[in-house]
UniProtKB/Swiss-Prot annotation:
In seeds, mostly in embryo, and seedlings, especially in vascular tissues. Confined to the hypocotyl, cotyledons, the root cap, and the root quiescent center. GO terms for molecular function: DNA binding; DNA-binding transcription factor activity; sequence-specific DNA binding; transcription cis-regulatory region binding. This is Ethylene-responsive transcription factor ABI4. Its main location: nucleus. Residues 27-37, 113-138 have a biased composition (Low complexity).
Length: 328
């Protein structure tokens, strides 16, 4: 064989190898471009976080939203459930639809919520503790209303001889709220008021003595006739009459001091064995019996007489015009 021909053939093979090596970078670039295009196509099918969550029936769109769908039983169709902001919301929607369609055979993405077990345990704990709390509450309850006061002997220890309570007695406290309104009394009524205070203190002292001796079984030492009896209707009429007439002695401090001194002197001078003589309350006050309204009083209005009444009303007809008489 000719050595020149063999050498020429060897050079030709080397040239072919060089051309192949020069063509290899192009093939590598084509493979790289094909792989990158395939990756782009894969990314377009789902969102970037689609591989992180593996929930049944849940997938992510390329723009980031999550969608949920469920396959209906015994069918190949899927039921659309909606678009959600997070994967957990889409998974919950799938679980609700699965329970509705499959019942107890549903395969859920999320386990049953633990708050239900927590609530059941808390309810059991509360049920266990409720008897103790109810017993403690019944033990701590107290009556809202006060207990009634014990009844006293005779049933009249809280009231005076004329139904006036001792704890609010205007005669003993020296108050003038009932006898004297905002305008007060005239001096004459002030004197009458002093006499009424004296009489009320005397009656109260007699009643207390009577009640104390009744409790000690010594009622024989006191005569019931020592307590002067006045008409309650006349008493209230006197009070109302004093309020209507009015005066300027309600706020007089000196008159109040006189009342207090008079009350002390009368209270110290009175005793059980030597009661003072009976005094007519109406005459001692200087009041006209015509002003009193009671069982034995027949006159109410203080007129001078029937002649004055008839004369005053009879004079009305003297002023009637005789011309008007024709129309009657």
């Amino acid at each position: 064989m000719d050595p020149l021909a063999s050498q020429h053939q060897h050079n030709h093979l080397e040239d072919n190898n060089q051309t192949l090596t020069h063509n290899n970078p192009q093939s590598d670039s084509t493979t790289d471009s094909s792989t990158s295009s395939a990756q782009r196509k894969r990314k377009g099918k789902g969102g970037p976080d689609n591989s992180k969550f593996r929930y049944r029936g849940v997938r992510q769109r390329s723009w980031g939203k999550w969608v949920a769908e469920i396959r209906e039983p015994r069918k190949r169709t899927r039921k659309w459930l909606g678009t959600f902001a997070t994967a957990e919301d889409a998974a919950r929607a799938y679980d609700r639809a699965a329970v509705y369609l499959y019942g107890s055979r549903a395969q859920l993405n999320l386990t049953p919520s633990s708050p239900s077990s927590v609530s059941s345990s808390s309810s059991s704990v509360s049920a266990a503790s409720s008897p103790s709390t109810s017993s403690s509450s019944t033990q701590t309850l107290r009556p809202l209303l006060p207990r009634p006061a014990a009844a006293t002997v005779g049933g009249g220890a809280n009231f005076g001889p004329y139904g006036i309570p001792f704890n609010n007695n205007i005669f003993l406290n020296g108050g003038t709220s009932m006898l004297c309104p905002s305008y007060g009394f005239f001096p004459q009524q002030q004197q009458q008021q002093n006499q009424m205070v004296q009489m009320g203190q005397f009656q109260h002292q007699q009643y207390q003595n009577l009640h104390s001796n009744t409790n000690n079984n010594k009622i024989s030492d006191i005569e019931l006739t020592d307590v002067p009896v006045t008409n309650s209707t006349s008493f209230h009429h006197e009070v109302a009459l004093g309020q209507e007439q009015g005066g300027s002695g309600c706020n007089n401090n000196s008159s109040m001091e006189d009342l207090n001194s008079l009350a002390g002197s009368v209270g110290s001078s009175l005793s059980i064995t030597h009661p003072p003589p009976l005094v007519d309350p109406v005459c001692s006050m200087g009041l006209d019996p015509g002003y009193m309204v009671g069982d034995g009083s027949s006159t109410i209005w203080p007129f001078g007489g029937e002649e004055e009444y008839s004369h005053n009303w009879g004079s009305i007809w003297d002023f009637i015009d005789p011309i008007l008489g024709e129309f009657y």
